[in-house]
Structure formats: structure tokens, C-alpha cells
């Protein structure tokens, strides 16, 4: 699937733009989770539709009323699911919002590249660049990765790989 019409040069630009954004997204998401809780960190990350809507508006695309309605309903549900009393750190909230903003930038910017080059190719290039950026941290925890190889493969293949094939 990747080899068909595969030109590495055309993937450099999306990789260099989206890869660092993906690395920022990952680091800030996990930092938010560490400073607060999984529920608060993931809840903040899932505020990204609001930022996608805002970015699209800034690009001149007027949101449809049903989109605003559905996102509003989603945020009301998110409010009820989040346990506000678990918010321990304003810094964690900041990291969660940065994670959501970087994810929304990946979606908005990546849409153009994906329509031209294909989503799988773009995902490959951004994952490659993000992996290179974060390799130092992976190297420092290589013993954990080796001890937990099955978990690492599951997280890498199923959660990341399968998730990205839908995008």
C-alpha cells in the first residue's frame, strides 16, 4: 500500500511539519496525565474539536450550525464525565490544552497533505519524524521496552497503527 507511487521527497514536507506537532502532542498529553489524572488528561485532549472548529473558522470556513451543536453536546458530556475535583495542577491543564491544540493542528494541516498524498503515507512520514525527535527518550527507557515487549508491540501496532489507518 505504501510502495504504490511512493516518492520519499513528497513526504519530507508533511513529515517535517506534522512530525514535530505529533511529538508535542504525545509529550504534552502524557505530561497532562501525569500531573492530573488519566480522566482529566484525556478529557482535555478530547477538547480538540473545539480547536479544529476555531482553526477552520480562522481559515475562513464557516462552521455549520449542526457542527457547533454536536461539539457543544460533546463538551457537555465531557463536563459530566470529568471529575473536576481530580484537577490537581493548572500546569497539567495547560499541557492538556497544548496537546489538544497540537492535535487539532495535525488534523487541519494534515487534511491537505492526506488528500494529496494519502493518509497512510502522511501518517508514516509524521510518525517517522516524531519517532526521530523522541528517540532519546525511548533510548533512556529501553530496558522497560525490552521487559515489556508485548505491551510495546500492542501499544505501537494496535493503538497507534490501527488508529492511524482510520485517518
Range-by-range predicted roles:
Residues 2-5, 29-31, 47-69:
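C-terminal transmembrane-helix exit sites in multi-pass transporters
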Residues 37-38, 64, 118-119:
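A helix-boundary/kink motif common to multi-pass secondary transporters
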Residues 16-35, 80, 97-109, 137-167:
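Hydrophobic alpha-helical transmembrane segments of multi-pass membrane transport proteins
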Residues 17, 44, 66-69, 91, ...:
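Hydrophobic core positions of alpha-helical segments in small-molecule transporters
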Residues 46-50, 71-74, 78, 100, ...:
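Residue-level recognition of pore/gate-forming positions within transmembrane alpha-helices
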Residues 1, 52-53, 85-141:
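Transmembrane alpha-helical segments that form core, pore/gating elements
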Residues 33-35, 60, 114:
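Helix-capping/transition residues at the boundaries of transmembrane alpha-helices
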Residues 17-20, 63-83, 134:
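Hydrophobic transmembrane alpha-helices of multi-pass small-molecule transport proteins
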Amino acid at each position: 500500500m505504501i510502495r504504490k507511487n511512493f516518492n520519499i521527497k513528497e513526504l519530507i514536507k508533511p513529515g517535517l511539519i506534522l512530525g514535530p506537532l505529533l511529538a508535542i502532542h504525545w509529550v504534552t498529553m502524557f505530561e497532562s496525565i501525569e500531573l492530573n489524572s488519566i480522566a482529566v488528561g484525556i478529557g482535555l485532549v478530547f477538547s480538540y474539536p473545539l480547536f479544529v472548529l476555531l482553526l477552520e473558522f480562522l481559515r475562513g470556513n464557516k462552521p455549520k450550525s449542526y457542527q457547533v451543536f454536536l461539539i457543544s453536546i460533546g463538551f457537555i458530556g465531557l463536563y459530566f464525565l470529568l471529575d473536576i475535583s481530580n484537577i490537581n495542577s493548572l500546569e497539567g491543564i495547560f499541557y492538556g490544552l497544548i496537546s489538544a491544540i497540537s492535535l487539532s493542528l495535525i488534523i487541519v494541516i494534515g487534511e491537505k497533505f492526506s488528500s494529496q498524498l494519502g493518509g497512510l503515507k502522511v501518517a508514516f512520514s509524521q510518525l517517522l519524524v516524531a519517532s526521530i525527535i523522541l528517540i532519546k527518550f525511548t533510548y533512556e527507557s529501553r530496558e522497560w521496552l525490552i521487559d515489556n515487549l508485548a505491551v510495546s508491540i500492542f501499544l505501537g501496532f494496535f493503538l497507534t497503527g490501527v488508529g492511524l489507518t482510520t485517518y
